[in-house]
């Protein structure tokens, strides 16, 4: 029993010691009680055994080859980008798990810059790597960020997203990965210093520089702007990996202007911009090119690894629809299966969907919206039709509002 019959004092059910001036005992249901000291012991026990980092110091970090193999299951194409990212992530966590001793060489962070068109897989690559490493992951849109004191999001709000995705565990968040999308949109308006404030350009780059290189940041727990006397969350960004991505429209012309030279001698040829692959040009990007584009030199120096992504071809988009573990068509087939519908896509239909994404210039990002629009009526009708059903998608239905997919009932007896 929790209560001593003789003295009437509560007794802790765990340590069997009575309530006193130095021991507070809280009664619970069923005659159970616990003292404040046992509560403290339980809290210490939970904290000591709680797993805050799936990646531990035992050295069991996935190798670059294992990371790439995992990426291959979810991401089609972009072989060079996969290899570069796999090595960068491996080296980053290897560096964390082996902190330098006194007088040791200090290894700097391997932050990554991804250059590639919209829908080429930049976000998916970063997200899939974080999934494999089992670390918190956050996506930030650079276009929403503004310099402190102006309308918009503070840079620190990026860190708040990471903390929230780590369920409030600061230590776990400090091992996470942040993907900053559309980093090219915060380029300063010109190479010359302007007399007017560039609140969403160079000022944001300066603010990003601090958290990317590693600092102890103060984050408002509820988001928004900082206020005096407000309690702040403290987070060290030293071990957070930053992957930045952008389309960098116009950067190819800057690179072309630098590498193009006048022909020397008879028969000399100069490869024109129209004849060069965009990825081929991005592979030759130098820090000076990025400075001319509008990024500040200090920020470029903190993102040492740069890799170009290929523009996805129709063949790539066709494979994306059917091959990955979570391929879009596989997802829709599983969804329709729950309503007892067998969904099939003709090969020509899949190719037509890929071509439509190319025509719309949306890349892989636009594939899902195309299929969603195509399947809307069928998804609306399927739950109301009883029995085993079939739905076949052919080429004529793609982009043709007059030829909509229709569900066929296979077993009339069950209808």
Curated annotation (Swiss-Prot):
Q: Which CDD domains is this protein grouped with?
A: RecA-like_ClpX (cd19497)
Q: Which GO terms describe its cellular component?
A: HslUV protease complex
Where does the signal sequence lie? none
Q: Name one GO molecular function term.
A: ATP hydrolysis activity
- Give binding positions for ATP: 117-124
Q: Which PROSITE patterns match?
A: CLPX_ZB
UniProt keyword annotation of Glycoprotein present: no
- Keyword line: ATP-binding, Chaperone, Metal-binding, Nucleotide-binding, Zinc
- The chain's coiled-coil residues are none
From which domain of life does this come? Bacteria
According to its UniProt entry, the protein's GO biological process terms are: cell division; proteolysis involved in protein catabolic process
* Domain ClpX-type ZB stretches: 1-54
Q: At which positions is Zn(2+) bound? A: 12, 15, 35, 38
Family membership, please give it.
Belongs to the ClpX chaperone family.
Q: How does it assemble?
A: Component of the ClpX-ClpP complex. Forms a hexameric ring that, in the presence of ATP, binds to fourteen ClpP subunits assembled into a disk-like structure with a central cavity, resembling the structure of eukaryotic proteasomes.
Give the protein's biological function.
ATP-dependent specificity component of the Clp protease. It directs the protease to specific substrates. Can perform chaperone functions in the absence of ClpP.
Q: What is this protein called?
A: ATP-dependent Clp protease ATP-binding subunit ClpX
Name the source organism.
Answer: Treponema denticola (strain ATCC 35405 / DSM 14222 / CIP 103919 / JCM 8153 / KCTC 15104)
